[in-house]
Design a protein with these regions (language model features):
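A short pre-motif secondary-structure segment
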Residues: 69-75, 109
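Catalytic strand-loop-helix junctions within cyclic-nucleotide turnover domains
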Residues: 83-91, 106-108, 112-131, 155-159, ...
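Short amphipathic alpha-helices in soluble, non-transmembrane regions
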Residues: 94-101
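Beta-strand residues that line the small-molecule/cofactor-binding core
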Residues: 30, 110-112, 178, 196
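Active-site core of bacterial EAL-family cyclic-dinucleotide phosphodiesterase domains
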Residues: 15, 162-201
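Interdomain signal-transducing alpha-helical coiled-coil linkers
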Residues: 9, 156, 160-167
Length: 201
């Protein structure tokens, strides 16, 4: 099937690096594809239908690779990647085409596909692996435009680092018993009776 024919992670990264090295004069984006709530898709329609969806996506991407000569890859789960021009119209065309794969025949639930983009020219020091990582960060940080296309910005990475730092600090504080728990009474202003408690940390 198509999933066995599409390049896996290491092969794709090598193909992508070779492609970018030989097409430096053109503007490219590395794109990560995300089927939003794919686990829910599996839950609703079964893993067989989920596997069929992945196979259909892989088939479309292999057709794209055959006609365009640009690398595509599959990293497992629902993680697909491709290289495409830094051109909004062509990017939107890809989203529309691939969306047909995830629009189910069942009309009760609609699933959407998103594209996370990392513009290669904006990150000249990044290798293929870093570009893919940035594209994955972008696809998980929707801009609420409704377009299904999310472009990487360094602020996304800064936000992830800040979140991780906060989680580390919270874990450290829990380990060292640095939180104090208080119960503040809530009183009826007329009867002055205690009617509840408010938890404060």
């Amino acid at each position: 099937d198509a999933l066995t024919a599409i390049a896996r992670k290491e092969d794709f990264l090598q193909h992508l690096q070779d492609f970018l090295d030989t097409h430096k004069t053109e503007k490219w984006c590395v794109a990560a594809i995300d089927v939003e709530h794919f686990r829910l898709y599996n839950e609703l329609y079964g893993t067989a239908q989920g596997d069929a969806l992945l196979n259909t996506l892989a088939s479309h991407l292999l057709d794209y690779q055959k006609t365009s000569g640009r690398p595509v890859g599959y990293w497992g789960n629902d993680d697909f990647f491709l290289c495409l021009p830094d051109d909004r119209v062509q990017q939107q065309d890809i989203v529309i085409t691939l969306q047909t794969c995830v629009s189910p025949n069942h009309q009760d639930v609609t699933f959407f596909l998103a594209l996370g983009l990392c513009p290669v020219s904006e990150h000249p020091e990044a290798d293929a692996a870093a570009l893919c990582n940035y594209a994955q960060i972008a696809v998980m940080n929707p801009d609420h435009s409704g377009s299904g296309i999310h472009r990487f910005a360094p602020a996304m990475l800064d936000s992830l680092k800040a979140q991780q730092q906060l989680l580390s600090e919270l874990e450290h504080a829990l380990d060292n018993h640095e939180f104090t728990f208080f119960l503040q009474p809530k009183c009826n202003s007329i009867t002055r009776a205690i009617v509840g408690m408010e938890a404060l940390v």
